[in-house]
Amino acid sequence: MNMHDLTTVESFSEEDVLHKIRLAEEFKNGKTIELTRPVYAMNLFFENSTRTHTSFEMAESRLGMRLLEFEAKTSSVTKGESLLDTVKTIDAIQTDIAVIRHPQNDYYKQLLEADLNISIVNGGDGSGQHPSQSLLDMMTIYQEFNHFDGLKIAIAGDIAHSRVARSNAMLLNKLGAEVYFAGPEAWMAEDLKAYGTFLPIDELVEKVDVMMLLRIQNERISQDTAIKFEPHEYLQEYGLTFERADRMQPTAIIMHPAPVNRGTEIESSLVDGEKSRIFKQMTNGMYMRMAILTDVLEAKGLIKGGLH
């Protein structure tokens, strides 16, 4: 698989996923690489981010890359410059890799068609794809169960507006897992019906191996269609309460891509509880992003001696 760019999980095979997990685990165990020359990366985030942004920064730093600063609010984007021209600019100064998060779905397609030398890594596009989050989630699940086939995975919350739901549902299907969705009926996306079954959360808690919660994506919900919930009301109706968590299987785990709205989609203390793998996901995220970037570097011939 050509990893010059990583923009979507659509073309990933099971072997591609397992390769990424193995490589991430190697970095976790102390693997290092040597670059053939100074490598320059830039993270262009047009939406707010804590985990993805800092995780990529840490991954780039650990791999010995040189990071160029970019702030959307102080860039020429505020003067009307298009995303394409912004990326063509940083390509012109010979930046090697751009990690981009953008509110527009499929923003990366125009960049891939522009015949640029710079590699594009998708840090999240609107409600479309979030490949690095999906891969770190697969790593977390694999660490727990050592397989995907036949696992029952519930994705619960604001499904319609979630790029994590789309990427994970798509990838989990390819890996042989059974996917279920839960949440307000108005937020059940039609395009995801091909990937899983929609059921009330009370029907799912006892049967699933993984309960993956999602926050309400207020920034993507138009005001005229917004469903208004008080946090406690939403928790009781659609979230993971103590009572529901008590009914989960002994080996089942709780996941969340974060940020977590404690007391809304999940009881606060469950975030730090025995079943939670939420902060483990974040640690895995750094190593998985090292793996993602390493495959890009390898495709560009920038690793001394190649990847072994």
From Swiss-Prot:
GO biological process, one term: 'de novo' UMP biosynthetic process
Alphabetical list of PROSITE patterns matching this protein: CARBAMOYLTRANSFERASE
Pathway(s) the chain acts in: Pyrimidine metabolism; UMP biosynthesis via de novo pathway; (S)-dihydroorotate from bicarbonate: step 2/3
The keyword Transferase appears for this protein: yes
Binding locations of L-aspartate: K79, R163, R215
Alphabetical UniProt keywords: Pyrimidine biosynthesis, Transferase
Gene3D superfamilies in the record: Aspartate/ornithine carbamoyltransferase (3.40.50.1370)
Annotated residues for binding of carbamoyl phosphate: R51, T52, R101, H130, Q133, A258, P259
GO MF annotation list: amino acid binding; aspartate carbamoyltransferase activity
Substrates-to-products reaction catalysed: carbamoyl phosphate + L-aspartate = N-carbamoyl-L-aspartate + phosphate + H(+)
Enzyme Commission designation: 2.1.3.2
Top EC class for this record: transferase
GO cellular component: cytosol
Domain of life: Bacteria
Family: Belongs to the aspartate/ornithine carbamoyltransferase superfamily. ATCase family.
Function: Catalyzes the condensation of carbamoyl phosphate and aspartate to form carbamoyl aspartate and inorganic phosphate, the committed step in the de novo pyrimidine nucleotide biosynthesis pathway.
Subunit text: Heterododecamer (2C3:3R2) of six catalytic PyrB chains organized as two trimers (C3), and six regulatory PyrI chains organized as three dimers (R2).
Protein name: Aspartate carbamoyltransferase catalytic subunit
